[in-house]
């Protein structure tokens, strides 16, 4: 059984097999968690991302973690919220699902996720958190032979509260 937990913290300091980066489609760094991961990993991360030639929204690509405590960084561009009528829910679910599957393919037992798309991409946290957790729980059924622990690392108290409430509702 895969354990899913929610914590408040800094994803760049997580000692796990893989952290997930809420990237942009260029994979060349940006703001928010993407910028923080690139700064913490060092310039080798950008050099490793260049030959990947970007990544489509909802898809995932993997690089080494370089100076991070994590062995790998899994990059996934989440969708920009446009009111919910532009396939955003499916694209966000794809980001979580494809990232977890890629982690399993690379023999990762521990994976840390940020709250994808809820920052500058304005995805409503009240929709994103339950969707993320349901997707991860369902995907974990097929990756349980590899992935053992999934940690949602929340940057602030509000995000942690919403994810914790959604996780409690899902497990009850």
From Swiss-Prot:
Q: Which InterPro entries match?
A: Macro_dom, Macro_dom-like
Q: Which PROSITE patterns match?
A: MACRO
Q: Which residues form a coiled coil?
A: none
Locate the Macro domain: which residues?
Answer: 1-171
Q: What is this protein called?
A: Macro domain-containing protein lp_3408
Q: Which domain of life is it from?
A: Bacteria
Originating species = Lactiplantibacillus plantarum (strain ATCC BAA-793 / NCIMB 8826 / WCFS1) (Lactobacillus plantarum)
* Protein family per UniProt: Belongs to the MacroD-type family.
């Amino acid at each position: 059984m895969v354990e899913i937990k929610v914590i408040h913290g800094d994803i760049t300091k997580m000692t796990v097999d893989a952290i997930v980066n809420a990237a942009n489609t260029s994979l060349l760094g940006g703001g928010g968690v993407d910028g923080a991961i690139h700064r913490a990993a060092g310039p080798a991360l950008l050099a490793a991302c260049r030959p990947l030639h970007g990544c489509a929204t909802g898809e995932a690509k993997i690089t080494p973690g370089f100076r991070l405590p994590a062995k790998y960084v899994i990059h996934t561009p989440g969708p920009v919220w446009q009111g919910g009528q532009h396939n955003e829910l499916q694209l966000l679910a794809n980001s979580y699902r494809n990232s977890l599957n890629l982690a399993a393919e690379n023999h990762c037992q521990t994976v840390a996720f940020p709250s994808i798309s809820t920052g500058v991409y304005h995805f409503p946290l009240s929709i994103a958190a339950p969707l993320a957790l349901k997707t991860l729980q369902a995907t974990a059924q097929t990756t349980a032979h590899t992935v053992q622990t999934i940690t949602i690392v929340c940057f602030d108290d509000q995000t942690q509260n919403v994810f914790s409430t959604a996780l409690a509702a899902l497990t009850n």
